[in-house]
């Protein structure tokens, strides 16, 4: 009995050793298999933060891209405003050039009519000069007076009397003398604000009413000289 038992024990022992070896091999394989997933998991865990960082960088880039168009739009708006500013600046000059032109026509029309009635011409002249912006200063008027007296030598007395009052004569002024002040008026109109013409406008009619007070003999003299 004991021998059988011993054999059995040995057999069991042999089997147990084989089974243990198998178990060890299986456990080793299992640990290796378990180790590889762990390594894979570790690599995946290491990759995930990098991927997250890459994803975070992408939104930052997108945010920068979105801000860049906004900046570009802002720059475009600024450039457009700058372009509009120079465009808006010449407008007063154009307006100033356009405004002095009607006075020229108004002054030439009385010349065509030979201006017998100084009273009718005075209001026209007052309206014409009132329409002019911050325009001819006293120096410009004196220059106009000097040029006109040179060109209108025969009618010097009447011209001097009327021009000494600071108003235009009933006779037509040469277009050359008017063109020069008009060019001078454009910078004055751009530099001077709109308040200056309003301030000077009331003073102009007061000076311009004086030609109407001058005797009509002056106008008769001018007509006689022209004839």
UniProtKB/Swiss-Prot annotation:
Entry keyword annotation includes Cell membrane: yes
Record lipid sites (N-myristoyl glycine): 2
Phosphothreonine modification, residue list: 31, 36, 196
Keywords: Cell membrane, Cell projection, Isopeptide bond, Lipoprotein, Membrane, Myristate, Phosphoprotein, Ubl conjugation
Basic and acidic residues: compositionally biased ranges: 15-27, 49-107, 137-150
Tissue: Brain.
Position of the signal peptide: none
Location in the cell: Cell membrane; Cell projection, Growth cone
InterPro entries per the UniProt record, alphabetical: BASP1
Biased composition annotated in UniProt, kind: Basic residues: 1-11
Record PTM Phosphoserine, positions in chain: 164, 170, 172, 176, 195, 219
Compositionally biased residues, Low complexity: 151-161
Pfam families assigned: BASP1
Domain of life: Eukaryota
Membrane topology of the entry: Lipid-anchor
Gene Ontology biological-process entries: negative regulation of DNA-templated transcription; protein homooligomerization; supramolecular fiber organization
One term under GO cellular component: growth cone
Single Gene Ontology MF annotation: transcription cis-regulatory region binding
Family: Belongs to the BASP1 family.
Name listed for the protein in its UniProt record: Brain acid soluble protein 1
Organism this protein belongs to: Bos taurus (Bovine)
